[in-house]
Amino acid sequence: MHWITRFSAFFSAALAMILLSPSLQSFSPAAAIRSSHPYADEFKPQQNSDYSSFRESPMFRNAEQCRSSGEDSGVCNPNLVHVAITLDIDYLRGSIAAVNSILQHSMCPQSVFFHFLVSSESQNLESLIRSTFPKLTNLKIYYFAPETVQSLISSSVRQALEQPLNYARNYLADLLEPCVKRVIYLDSDLVVVDDIVKLWKTGLGQRTIGAPEYCHANFTKYFTGGFWSDKRFNGTFKGRNPCYFNTGVMVIDLKKWRQFRFTKRIEKWMEIQKIERIYELGSLPPFLLVFAGHVAPISHRWNQHGLGGDNVRGSCRDLHSGPVSLLHWSGSGKPWLRLDSKLPCPLDTLWAPYDLYKHSH
């Protein structure tokens, strides 16, 4: 359990920095998505960065008490924990750090199967992943064709929210093998600081997805005035208790998803959006329209979200109260960009130990 001591040290250091900084402030979930800043160019991803320069990850082995995979070491092995993450050249450093964090904190790392979603076949990301994690055998690359969803995407408040790969999670039930009945979907801008199997074992009851919910958020802000004033739409949530949830951390029952054809339901709302303009925030609102009020609640410890803040100089996010199992830099600010720019937020120091980029910090 050496990682507990290591994490505690980083955690304590970050908290001390938070207490000493008068400029830290909190943002609502909506603000974390919408925020922008006058220094944006300083934090833009560098398209020509040498993303092949990653250190090789050490080998992570299962503890003795882990269930044996037996002869079946393929994706259909019932003892596997399935995790889906996108691979994009601009966020690749974040994705690799996320994988590294999961392996470091898992008691049974060899029982975790990673499903990587890519939207380009020309960047050879599979070779990069395999060279960075040479001992990781439980992985597969899935090509998500941008044209699958391109015609359904509407303009958003941030161009980054319009990228087709943001919508790949809508198609996990189609992309992954039919034998995969459940999957954890994770964004690329987070690290896991607890055993992922605890999240995997979350009970969903009769629900199709599970996620931490935030019922204090002003739910009406996620849709336009036209949506709420139109009789065709304003009854959508009737009989439901809709709450905001962040789609960057979800446990998904793929069997139910396939059974009830939720991909088609999401696509229907995206088609309406193209004509009616009922929301502004990219891939999140269609999920809210379909699932809000029908989500199995998961402990907030599994999504300490909004840590990206808005990159305004001297303005950073604090942690929510309570225990922490997952740190999520949602919002426009990413820890690797701030660290490289020598303008980090205190909590970015908790991301840095999982960074495998050779020439960082």
From Swiss-Prot:
Subcellular location, principal: Golgi
Membrane-spanning ranges: 7-27
Record has Cell division as a keyword: no
Compartment annotation: Golgi apparatus membrane
Keyword match Cell wall biogenesis/degradation: yes
Membrane topology: Single-pass type II membrane protein
Topological domain spans for side Lumenal: 28-361
Keywords for the protein's UniProt record, in alphabetical order: Cell wall biogenesis/degradation, Glycoprotein, Glycosyltransferase, Golgi apparatus, Membrane, Signal-anchor, Transferase, Transmembrane, Transmembrane helix
Coiled-coil stretches: none
Family: Belongs to the glycosyltransferase 8 family.
Function: May be involved in pectin and/or xylans biosynthesis in cell walls.
Name listed for the protein in its UniProt record: Probable galacturonosyltransferase-like 5
Gene behind the chain: GATL5
